[in-house]
Amino acid sequence: MNDRVELQTEVGAARALVFPLVATADGLRRWLDGATLDPRVGGELRVTMRDAQAVGRILALDPPQHISFSWDWLERPLGVASVVAFDVIDHGARTWVTLRHVGLPNAAQVALHEEMWRHWLDRFEEACRALAQLA
């Protein structure tokens, strides 16, 4: 069974600018509707995406290249443990970002989460462009 979403993007900003967008509360708020994050392994994460909130705990943190956290919806839990990971790979003035969301319970949830992450990654790319222009 395919229980995962995996998406990749390449952005025109240095990794030093990109990693904080996935690993700090201020960075997440640049492309999500809201976020709180305790940036340490075991720290709590809470994000708002439109009218939904997701919660989790930081599972791994290896700046400036990797963060992963558990993920579940506050109002409508998935009923399984799922994990979101971002890998941020330096490529000179550009950065490759891979998002993986694994442990989704069924094909319908995979499809819903893929659509959701595509939307939010578009906003992530916009935030990267804005930061690159300021740098």
Where are these regions (language model features)?
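Hydrophobic-ligand binding "helix-grip"
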Residues: 33-39, 48-96, 102
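Hydrophobic ligand-binding cavity/cleft-lining segments
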Residues: 1-36
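Short, intrinsically disordered, mixed-charge
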Residues: 20-33, 63, 118-129
